[in-house]
Amino acid sequence: MSVPLSYTWRNLAARKLTTLLTACGMALVVFVFATVLMLEEGLRKTMVETGSPDNVIVTRRSAGTEVQSLVERDQAAIVENQPEVAYGIDGARLASKETIVLIALPKRDSNKTSNVLIRGVGQKGIELRPQVEITEGRMFHPGSTEIIAGKNIAERYKGAGVGETLRFAQREWTVVGIMDAGKSGFDSEIWGDVDQLMQAFRRPVYSSVILKLNDAATFPQLKSRIEEDPRLTLEAKRESIFYAEQSQVLANFIRYLGMMLSIIFSAGAIIGAMITMYASVANRATEIGTLRALGFRRGNILTAFLVEALMLGAAGGIIGLTMASFMQFFTISTMNWQSFSELAFSFILNLEIILKSFAFALIMGVVGGFLPAVRAARLNIVDSLRAV
């Protein structure tokens, strides 16, 4: 015979203030836990969606990032003429020789400057990225000092809106379009003509070469040929994998810092739940004795108090997840430690994060309620009935 759930529920409802405060304490911990997971997922999604599995990025061997990479002009010519590279409808190869440069720009809401990544792209650069769309203005003309800005750059930095001008590399550059890259890393970049940018920054070499495969299954052959060619000191990776690796350092930092904070805060929430449950046991000693006298076993009492603790944890989980869900409406920016430029991304809540956060809340409830539940189950019947 088990203790009815209605009994447990009425006990929580009878102590509204204590129940609410305990649940809110757990909710704050769940909020921190879920927000960290959402932040990590947002960063991962932003970086992974920057790359396409059909594209290959070729950089200098062991460079790690495009910023550190150098690809000679003759090497780039060899790479883009590999047989696995696809052709466009105009008969030209779908390859883009690109250069990466960092500049400092002032933000719109303050005069503080931050690094922004400038990407020089070839004529096929935007065709290789189907997720990129020009939402305002137009594409820049090849051979000109026109540029297009990612929507996050246009919103956050002075001079990055359509019709405005930016001055860098001793030239005036006119912003002629805004691109929406589907919440990928390209939203935090400025694009221009690769040849003009290389001349302006006096760079004789490219940073990378982007290729589209005519068949994704031919990647191993392309990779082997490029990396074994003695004329080249380059390595080839699928673009999606390359950008996913770029997010690892920052994602790991966010994860470990968030987990440490969650553990510290959860200790406080568990202690709070434990105090609440101990007080509940002390105040209901007579009730517990009556239940035992009516035939309920120690295991039934233990289960009833654990269910009560689980209900507290569930309430905290629901409140915390509800609070965390509103973070999806915010976009934050941080330094990408791989490229040393600012990267903007959003919080993303998915089913996996919901389940992990709710499970975390239930675990806090069980841990906080276990010892008080054991105490309740071990109370002597006669002593309990004498309690007033």
Feature names for model-found ranges:
Residues 328-355:
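Short juxtamembrane loops and helix-capping segments at transmembrane helix boundaries
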Residues 114-156:
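Short beta-strand boundary microenvironments
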Residues 374-388:
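Short cytosolic juxtamembrane segments of multi-pass membrane proteins
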Residues 16-43, 251-287, 310-319, 363-367:
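Hydrophobic alpha-helical transmembrane segments of multi-pass inner-membrane transport and secretion
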Residues 278, 283-332, 356-368, 372:
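Transmembrane alpha-helical interface segments in multi-pass membrane proteins
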Residues 27, 31-117, 136-138, 143, ...:
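Hydrophobic, regular-secondary-structure patches
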Residues 86-89, 95, 106-113, 139, ...:
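Mechanotransmission and gating elements of multispan inner-membrane complexes involved in transport
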Residues 1-6:
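Short, membrane-interfacial amphipathic segments enriched in basic
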